[in-house]
């Protein structure tokens, strides 16, 4: 069976690279990248392409290692070398791509076993995001008022939305009668073949990310005002108004959509200009979770609010913040053991 598949050709892969005994591991990674392109989302492909073409291929091409000769020690040397320049989390992503590619090589009988199975994956770095207090959130929303970041900041702070979810919000997801806000569309940016591409997708990160949240009065009022402002701008600009993004909440005065990189670049500048503590835009999501925890909201409800795929994700990220519940548990133990209502 192995011999029969030696010259197996994948129609969607680069024609100049043949899958045979002489194929370099670096060339095989490029072949796999093309094969997998049609089965993954464009943003995922962009991530894969960056890692494969900029990091994995140059390293292994320089060493001239054939796919059939690749050993676990070769991969371990690669991981160790990368750990000198990037964090463990990046190397974990490299490993994931290499493992998937080699699994495919086993599947089509180019190699008998997957050498990546024998390599110790680096331990993931423990990340603890920064969090704003309620007072800091109030200050931030005030300074963002009237800027292009006002709506993104408001929605990310209150609902804990991801950047892609905020920018992907459309008016048809807002029900002003039922007072609900539906998270079902995203806008992201990807780099494909060296070009930045805006990706608009009618789906969120996972099935659990598709969620409906209550539209609270203060935000309802602000969105109604925004809707009126956009209609006015559209009338005033006439044909000059960009109609490519009609329906989106986060557009500027002439209809241009607010792009992900704009938010990431301008948000820290807004903080610095106004003397606020530096955090990432994504930390507004963490700030939302920390405020919910501080006000006694159970972790399970926070999971649903944030749209995490499983409870463990929420627990792993925010368990160290759940001090309020620990105090409640301590008080319950004091009372249970007959120590009275002593404050813990």
What are these regions (language model features)?
Residues 66, 117-118, 178-184, 280, ...:
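Short functional hotspots where side chains directly engage DNA or cofactors
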Residues 1-73, 226-245, 323, 344:
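N-terminal DNA-binding module of tyrosine recombinases/phage integrases
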Residues 105-115, 176, 185-192, 223-240, ...:
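Proline-centered turn/helix-capping motifs that create local helix->coil transitions or kinks
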Residues 138-145, 192-199, 295, 316, ...:
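DNA/chromatin major-groove-contacting recognition/catalytic segments
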Residues 178, 189-210, 217-219, 225, ...:
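C-terminal secondary-structure termini that scaffold catalytic or DNA-interacting sites
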